[in-house]
């Protein structure tokens, strides 16, 4: 099973240097029923699925680096769920997110995995990609 995580340069640097990353955040206390995760959150899937998920994750996660990996022992990771905007439903209705009042966009629960601490010893990295989002150049002249 492949998992993915969008992360900052700083987080990636620590991970690649062999540090154990620790996050004790109980997301259910911060987001109520919108999340059952504790610690770091990971999406399920490969690079293609991660890039598709980016649409719902933008503004929530740091997108400096995309890491796709195979857990060495999936039992160390806890299944959880997070509630996000359901862009597939919006697209199927022929609408865009701006057609809904703020806070009333269609949402659904997505399966994820979480863990409170991990290091390179816990994962086999398959993909590390930087600059996931396109760079826009605006010419004001």
Regions found by a protein language model. Give the residues of each.
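ADP-ribose/NAD+-binding catalytic cleft of ART/PARP-like enzymes
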Residues: 1-38, 55
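Compositionally biased amphipathic helical and low-complexity segments enriched in hydrophobic
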Residues: 4, 16-17, 22, 55-58, ...
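Short, flexible beta-strand-to-coil junctions
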Residues: 6-12, 45, 61, 68-75
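Active-site-adjacent loop/helix micro-motif of nuclease/hydrolase catalytic cores
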Residues: 16, 51, 77-79
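Active-site and NAD+-binding cores of ADP-ribose-processing enzymes
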Residues: 26, 62-141
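Amphipathic alpha-helical packing elements
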Residues: 37-42, 48
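Short active-site loop/helix that positions an aromatic residue
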Residues: 46-61
């Amino acid at each position: 099973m492949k998992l993915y995580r969008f992360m900052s340069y700083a987080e990636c640097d620590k991970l690649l240097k062999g540090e154990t990353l620790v996050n004790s955040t109980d997301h259910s206390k911060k987001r109520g029923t919108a999340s059952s995760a504790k610690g770091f959150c990971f999406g399920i899937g490969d690079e293609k699925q991660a890039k598709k998920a980016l649409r719902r994750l933008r503004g929530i996660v740091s997108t400096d680096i995309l890491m796709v990996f195979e857990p060495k022992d999936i039992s160390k990771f806890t299944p959880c769920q997070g509630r996000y905007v359901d862009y597939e439903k919006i697209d199927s209705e022929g609408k865009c997110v701006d057609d809904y009042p703020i806070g009333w966009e269609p949402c659904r629960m997505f399966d994820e995995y979480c863990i409170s601490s991990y290091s390179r010893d816990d994962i086999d990295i398959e993909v590390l990609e930087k600059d996931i989002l396109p760079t826009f150049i605006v010419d004001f002249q």
